[in-house]
Swiss-Prot record:
Location relative to the cell: Nucleus
Biased composition (Basic residues): 229-238
Name of the featured protein: Sterol regulatory element binding protein sbp-1
PANTHER family with a match to the protein in the record: LP12374P (PTHR46062:SF1), STEROL REGULATORY ELEMENT-BINDING PROTEIN (PTHR46062)
Species annotation: Caenorhabditis elegans
Acidic residues composition-biased segments: 324-337
Induction note: Expression increased by oxygen deprivation. Expression increased by glucose or fructose supplementation. Expression increased by simulated microgravity.
SMART domains, per the entry: HLH (SM00353)
Chain ranges passing through the membrane: 478-498, 541-561
UniProt keyword Nucleus, yes or no: yes
């Protein structure tokens, strides 16, 4: 195709032809640097993948760029390389690594990372920035160093500043540009020991100025001027490489006054007594922590003689051990002798056993003296100097005194808090509370903290824990409610009153005598007794019910007013609650749902509340919340719950407390809906009764707080009602669930209508008929909300949101609506046969009518970003609505416009389809990384060109370009991993749509190159083979994904077209077209049945009939 058509589409804007006419698009023989190579890497989006056009450096030349940081080239350096045939680079058989990977655009690798010291990296010398103060050194003056010295030790003289970069030659290469410095020979990697004593210069070791005096020459000058006679002494050294070889370098004994330093024997003291005194003085001056570290150190001891006269006597030796570079031990600072060694060298002194025992006794004596002094000081403070107390009595007296002082402090703090509240209620200024630090924080570091022996007594003196308070309050409320139910059901007072009346009537009734027969006419006693009995029973029953009503009112008031704790916003417990709640919300935002639920439960315990235990407690708790909601519906419960508790807790404080508690219950209920219980056991299943209790608690407390400045915003109250509606749909039976779920949803709708539009725009999709139909299936809703489901792979269709129930419902609703659009576009539901996620059910598959405009607008509404910032005006610290914001979904919006445009094209509504072109062109970055998205986009561009740019001479060129790109993307997508379930059905539907657009575009562009006056089989044009090849590939792939069903007339029409483009017999093609046309007419008349997905493509059938008009005789 490249030989026939010139130009290409830019990958930085691949869908440019959607909003631009083809005549206005310039050819693209050379793409912009921001675009990709369309022939090789066009499927990889993003301009950052473009390779760097800079030419890499020559890796086989000596690393002059590495030595010369300024990048200068000097003739003398090249001359030095050419003249020294014995140079190390001359014998090098490999190229040194190029550390400047950034091409000069950033810091080099050698400047930012440490070298390992192995391989070719150990032969390269680090750069140096400070000039040396000596004379001009020779080029081959090389001294091997250890790896730690090469990387850390600065090469400097006492007269120069410190340098951060050191080379192993000790020469500043920046200032000596007239000499080429050679690295060490690559056959030797074993550094030799140094004979000079290392000096500390600004915290670093300098190995280059050891033999140089204040005014003397440098070491290298001495080495090359007058080397004295010497003898070789070999000493073991730690090796860097595994295979060491001999090094061809100057000997280390050439310098004068060389001494071996690897094993140092100290000079013996004048007498053993002096040595012992010095050791004891050293141990006494050491701190206890240093002594402990000294005792725990492990080292080997070596023996040596201390002179010819005392050869058999043991003496202390000092052994130098070199530690590894990366060993970071905090005890390396202190040696056994109290001296600090440098460069990881530790001096270990081994003393005789008698001396060590003496040191231990001194340390123990020091401890005992310190303890006795402190106990004596305590006794003087408590009882005076004359008192006689033992150590235990003194400590016991001190503990009792401390407890008494703490108790007094608690009482004083309580009084101060009450006075502060009184001043606050009277609106008088009051001082801020003083924060006192603990004694342990003010104590010195050296003193070891005493164990908290009075912790148990302090806990007994304090009040009970919030969890116990909440459990006790909850059980008391359940008990009161149980008593209320018992009074209403059994009426024990009425039974007692009835039994008393019956016994009284029985006592007053006359006793019939067996000897008396007959009756007395007009006896007044029976009538009067009966009248008095009825009058007495009515009066007595009224008394009983008045008493029952009074008891009910008492219980209700007790439960509503005194049963709900009101929080004090100035207390310490409230500050603890706020801190724990913020931590829980942070865990929730990070995705740690279980830990967030545990912290929310801790917040509930801090507010003196608790969740009911499974069983009878849950049943009575849910029953009481139902009764309370009935009272709230009658406005009796709201009026009683908002009453002022005390002077310090007015109505505003009560409403704010109820609002905060309602939001807390709502947040716990949100996680409970997703299957998070807050327990450590994963096998614990969430209870439906517990969910009902939390939802009803949130609703009742929200109604008690009210939708006011001191209460909750209407958007938050609407979301609380929505969660209660979802819980009723999940927990209640099928007969009761629709009624109660609809009841709470209507109350939420009422708050949404009264709230400002900008604050509730993120909740409007809940009340759409399609959403209500989606949420009517309890099993599907439970599966969507469950956290134990597998991670759904939605591909590039929607953004996956899993942090709240509404977010999960919104995500799956997007997939549900996209599947409805794909069903409408493809014309069948066979692609959704495998339904694993339960997003589609049987009723959804039977629905063939889809309101495209309604579904498209709903999808765009759901996918639009909306962040509602809701804050309580009077309480700035109590912020609501931070979890109700909604992020935008650009991918879902893009797919919605693409599918809607395809449906409009299928219905011949081209004007409505043009309204989506500009929105489709603004492709999200995630679509550019998805092969299916790119394929559909290019196929849509090709179809748009054939529909709207038919008169342009570039139609064939750009149709071939876009179809080729689309087929390449579809080929890559078929080999990549795909999703399953309903998402897989959406992918298959969009693939079919892309192949159909490709074949329609190719047929339309092929026909535009023909003359209508001649038969098509007698004509040929440039690029005809390109159309037939591309169409053949598209048809083959479409046949594979469509299956081998015999009743698919659509596939048969595509096969006829493919044969026609490849030069088949026109007579056979025409006979097949006549057969398809007759079958379609029979389906229209109702003689045969034909599925929507099997109906022939109208454009293909019409084009085939037009091309074979001359044969229709």
């Amino acid at each position: 195709m490249n030989e026939e058509f010139e130009g290409d589409v830019p990958m930085s804007d691949p869908f440019l032809s959607l909003v631009t006419k083809l005549d206005d698009i310039a050819p693209f023989p050379n793409n912009d640097p921001l675009d990709f190579d369309m022939e090789h890497n066009w499927q990889e989006p993003g301009p950052s993948q473009q390779p760097d056009p800079s030419i890499p450096g020559n890796q086989h030349s000596p690393p002059q760029e590495y030595y010369d940081i300024d990048g200068q080239r000097d003739v003398s350096t090249l001359h030095s390389l050419l003249n020294h045939n014995n140079d190390d680079f001359f014998s090098m058989r490999f190229s040194p690594p190029n550390f400047d990977l950034g091409g000069g655009r950033g810091p080099s690798l050698a400047a930012t990372q440490q070298l390992s010291g192995e391989g070719p990296a150990s032969m390269l010398n680090p750069l140096q920035t400070s000039p040396p103060s000596g004379g001009y050194p020779p080029a081959d003056a090389y001294r091997p160093l250890s790896l730690a010295q090469q990387l850390a030790a600065p090469a400097m003289t006492p007269h120069q500043a410190a340098s951060l970069f050191v080379n192993t030659n000790g020469i500043d290469q920046k200032n000596f540009t007239h000499a080429m410095l050679s690295p060490p020979h690559h056959t030797s990697m074993t550094p030799q020991p140094y004979t000079e004593a290392m000096e500390h210069i600004n915290g670093y070791m300098s190995p280059y100025d050891q033999a140089q005096g204040p005014s003397g020459p440098s070491y290298y000058s001495q080495h090359h001027q007058s080397p004295p006679p010497h003898h070789h002494h070999h000493h073991p050294m730690p090796k860097i490489h595994e295979n060491p070889e001999q090094v061809a370098s100057p000997s280390i004994e050439d310098a004068p006054e060389t001494k071996p330093t690897h094993l140092v024997e100290p000079q013996s003291p004048k007498s053993p007594q002096n040595m012992k005194e010095e050791l004891l003085r050293l141990l006494v001056n050491m701190s206890p922590s240093e002594v402990e570290r000294l005792k725990n150190k492990k080292s080997g001891a070596c023996s040596a003689t201390n002179g010819p006269s005392r050869s058999k006597e043991k003496a202390a030796k000092i052994v130098i051990q070199e530690t590894a570079e990366g060993d970071e031990d905090e005890d390396d600072e202190d040696s056994d002798s109290g001296e600090t060694m440098s460069q990881g060298t530790t001096i270990i002194v081994r003393r005789p056993k008698t001396e060590r025992r003496t040191a231990h006794n001194l340390i123990e004596k020091k401890y005992r003296c310190s303890i006795n002094d402190r106990i004596q000081q305590l006794k003087v403070l408590l009882c005076g100097d004359e008192a006689k107390l033992s150590k235990s009595a003194t400590l016991r007296r001190a503990i009792e005194h401390i407890e008494e002082v703490e108790h007094e402090n608690q009482v004083l703090k309580h009084h101060v808090e009450q006075m502060r509240k009184t001043l606050q209620n009277n609106r008088l200024p009051y001082p801020e509370p003083i924060q006192y630090t603990e004694y342990s924080a003010r104590s010195p570091v050296e003193s070891s903290p005493s164990p908290p022996r009075n912790e148990r007594k302090r806990s007994r003196m304090s009040t009970t824990t919030p969890m116990k308070n909440g459990t006790r309050d909850g059980s008391s409320k359940v008990t009161l409610f149980a008593m209320l139910l018992a009074v209403l059901i059994f009426n024990p007072i009425g039974l007692l009153a009835g039994s008393a009346i019956f016994s009284k009537a029985a006592a007053e009734a006359p006793i019939a005598s067996p000897f008396e027969h007959g009756r007395v006419i007009d006896d007044p006693d029976g009538t009067s007794t009966r009248t008095l009995f009825w009058e007495g029973s009515i009066i007595n029953m009224s008394y009983v019910w008045v008493f029952n009503i009074l008891m009910i009112i008492y219980v209700v008031v007790k439960l509503l007013i005194h049963g709900d704790p009101v929080q004090d916003f100035m207390s310490v417990s409230w500050q603890t609650f706020v801190t724990t709640r913020e931590k829980a919300r942070a865990e929730l935002n990070s995705g740690n749902l279980k830990d967030a639920q545990r912290k929310f439960c801790e917040c509930l315990a801090t507010l003196d509340r608790s969740l009911p235990s499974p069983g009878v407690d849950s049943v009575f708790s849910v029953g009481w919340e139902c009764v309370r909601h009935l009272l709230n519906w009658l406005w009796i419960g709201r009026y009683i719950a908002r009453r002022r508790r005390s002077t310090t807790k007015p109505v505003s404080v009560v409403c704010r407390s109820h609002a905060q508690t309602a939001v807390l219950y709502h947040e716990i209920h949100q996680l409970h809906l997703m299957g998070i219980t807050g327990n450590f056991e994963d096998t614990y299943e969430p209870s439906a009764l517990t969910g009902l209790f939390m939802s009803l608690c949130a609703v009742n407390l929200a109604e008690a707080a009210g939708a006011s400045n001191d209460g909750l915003p209407r958007a938050v109250m609407a979301q609380i009602y929505i969660s209660a509606s979802i819980q009723c749909r999940l927990a209640l039976p099928n007969l009761l669930a629709p009624f109660f779920s609809g009841y709470f949803l209507r109350r939420a709708r009422r708050h949404v209508r009264r709230a400002p539009e900008h604050s509730v725009s993120h909740l409007l999709w809940i009340f759409h008929p399609a959403t209500r139909k989606f949420m009517s299936d309890a099993k599907r809703l439970e599966h969507v909300l469950s956290s134990k489901q597998k991670q759904l792979r939605f591909g590039s269709f929607v953004e996956d949101e899993q942090l709240s129930p509404l977010a999960r419902i919104r995500t799956t609703l997007k997939v549900y609506l996209l599947s409805k659009l794909v069903q409408e576009l493809v014309g069948g539901d066979e692609i959704f046969t495998k339904n694993v996620e339960r997003i589609l059910n049987d009723n959804d598959r039977l629905d063939d009518e889809v309101d495209v405009v309604d579904v498209s607008r709903l999808l765009v509404t759901i996918s639009t970003q909306c962040a509602a910032i809701l804050t309580n005006e009077k309480d700035e610290s109590a912020k609501f609505g931070t979890w109700i914001s909604r992020n935008g979904d650009a991918c879902c919006t893009w797919w919605t416009h693409v599918l809607t445009c395809g449906i409009y094209w299928r219905s011949n509504k081209n004007e409505l389809a043009r309204q989506h072109y500009s929105l489709i062109r603004n492709c999200p970055p995630k679509i550019l990384t998805d092969n299916l998205g790119l394929a559909v986009g290019h196929a849509l561009c090709a179809r748009k060109i054939c529909i709207d740019d038919r008169d342009s001479p570039k139609v064939s060129q750009y149709v071939c370009i876009h179809t080729k790109k689309s087929l390449e993307s579809l080929r890559l997508f078929s080999t990549s991993s795909r999703a399953s379930g309903v998402v897989s059905g959406i992918q298959e539907g969009t693939r079919r749509m892309a192949y159909e657009w490709i074949m329609n575009s190719l047929l339309d562009a092929w026909r535009s190159n023909l003359f209508a006056s001649k038969p098509y089989w007698t004509q040929s044009f440039k690029g005809q083979s390109t159309f037939s090849t591309l169409y053949q590939e598209a048809y083959n792939h479409y046949a594979i994904i469509n299956g081998t069903r015999g009743d698919c007339w659509r596939l048969f029409v595509y096969e006829l077209t493919c044969r026609m483009l490849n030069g088949a017999n026109p007579q056979a093609t025409w006979s097949g077209v006549r057969r398809v046309r007759s079958t379609k007419m029979d389906a229209v008349r109702g003689r045969v049945s034909m599925r929507r997905s099997a109906q022939p493509d109208a454009f293909h059938l019409h084009t085939l009939v037009k091309l074979h008009t001359s044969m229709d005789l």
